[in-house]
Amino acid sequence: MIHVSDGDLTLRGDGSLTLSGWTDGAKIGSNGYSSDTGQGEEDFTGSIHITDDVTISATREYYNPSDTGSAAIGSGEKGNFTGTITIDGNAKVNADATWCGPGIGCGEKGDYNGDIIIGGNAEVTASGGSASAGIGSGWDSTFSGGTITIKDNSKVTAIGSNGFSQNTSCSNPAIGASEKANPDYNPAKAPMNGTITIT
């Protein structure tokens, strides 16, 4: 895990980095709530910039049914996302959350109100975990504002995951706000109050 909560991180050059395995927090970003300790959640208010010819693979591998719903890149479970993630240059990024969090964005039960910018010639694949968007918010989160921008010659593959609501199925968006829980675990879409721009 590369821990970034309120600081600034730049990954540049022409090397590659693989981050895998289970962690309570994001593989790159802020810490997440731990079901073992009952604490640990942390907001992401800083910035992450992935650029040049860097290749990044960030995968949160499934641990157990009480696993935390952190993003692969962004905020951990119960952590709000008000920072900025920029991926540009010729960077190649694969972000896979696997469980209740987005590939890139705000973890489970947090709030998305930051900025994700993908541009240049970047190539990005972002896969959401259970009931989560590929890019955006995790399960049972809010999306109160902020932006997601995809521009220039960048190529983005975003994959939302099916929900696990009782007796129903709920498909979540590739980009945007994820499924919102209710007392009966029937699917309900969270309000999407931010802006998505693809040019």
Predicted regions: what they are:
Residues M1-G21, S30-C100, I104-G128, I135-T199:
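Surface-exposed loop/turn motifs in large extracellular/passenger domains
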